[in-house]
Curated annotation (Swiss-Prot):
It comes from Synechococcus sp. (strain JA-2-3B'a(2-13)) (Cyanobacteria bacterium Yellowstone B-Prime). InterPro entries: UPF0145_dom_sf (IPR035439), UPF0145_YbjQ-like (IPR002765). This is UPF0145 protein CYB_1351. It comes from the Bacteria. PANTHER family: UPF0145 PROTEIN YBJQ. Belongs to the UPF0145 family. Disulfide bonds: none annotated. The lineage of its organism: Bacteria, Bacillati, Cyanobacteriota, Cyanophyceae, Synechococcales. HAMAP family: UPF0145.
Length: 103
């Protein structure tokens, strides 16, 4: 499965557009992780605990996006975008793209 942020692929032809696919991953926040992140913000520097959560969430959301596209018979997803959102109780990562059948 080919995933790309572009909407045109050099050297590949789109045989059929199969529709928009979306995926979402939600993680609950963690009191200890939040406390450690707050300390890090006061001291300064990167908050590795949250970076790891976002890294994992992005991997998971792309895996889910790929699975949903495969169910449509796609072998590629064009125009992939990933968005993150954080509230006091959760972290939301969404992905969207256009499922396609490539030649």
């Amino acid at each position: 499965m080919l995933l790309t942020t572009t909407d045109v692929l050099q050297g590949r032809e789109v045989e059929r557009y199969l529709g928009i696919v979306t995926a979402e991953v939600v993680y609950g926040t963690n009191v200890l992780r939040d406390f450690l992140a707050t300390l890090r913000n006061i001291i300064g520097g990167r908050t590795r605990t949250y970076e790891e959560v976002f890294e994992n969430a992005q991997k998971k959301v792309l895996e889910e996006l790929e699975q949903r596209a495969k169910r449509l018979g796609a072998n590629g997803i064009l125009g992939v975008s990933i968005h993150t959102n954080m509230s006091t109780t959760m972290i939301l990562v969404t992905a969207a793209g256009t499922a396609v059948k490539l030649r």
